[in-house]
Amino acid sequence: MTRLLYLDQNYLSGIAKGKAAFRDLEPALRDAIARGALGVAESAVHERESAPRPDLRLLELLRGLSGGRRQPAEPDAAGREVRRRMAWTIEHELSGRRPRGGDAADLDALAVALTHGDLVTCDAFNADVVRGARLDARHRCELFTGRRPDVLALRVRLAELTPEGETP
């Protein structure tokens, strides 16, 4: 079973810019894909969020990793429930945070990624939301933030994957 990875904009940008922790992640990603142990999925959110920075060529990078594999354009019933639970968690448990422009896009992307993927990257705030609502456990997803320890942990995790989805 091939594991499916959702890469958020932070990870794509880090790889494109050659940031330290991400520089070592890209070869691990490509190796896991080449072994048949990992698939990467594109989303409509990637297209919207990449538009302001065409110089980084994020979509080209993503397409090179995904091979054209796409997430569903819209969340299914499980995805809509995930989105509702994340929005509720933000409103009721994290109400002190001021909303940002990309929040709705993040919720949309994560709603699909959590219900259709195995490994999901997101920012630390959204990881707190997902974990607070226990959506990672419910949907059996592994979360990785853009913080250096998580980026390094993802690299190690990718090296462990086999085409059958088992760790050696």
Model-derived segments and spans:
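Short, well-structured N-terminal submotif of metal-dependent ribonuclease cores
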Residues: M1-A44, R48-L65, R69-R100, D128-R138, ...
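Short beta-strand and adjacent tight-turn residues that come in two discontinuous sequence segments
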Residues: C122
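Acidic, metal-associated active-site segment
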Residues: S50, A104-H116
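Asp-based, Mg2+/Mn2+-dependent phosphohydrolase catalytic module
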Residues: L143-P168
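Short active-site oxyanion
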Residues: G36-G39, T115-L119
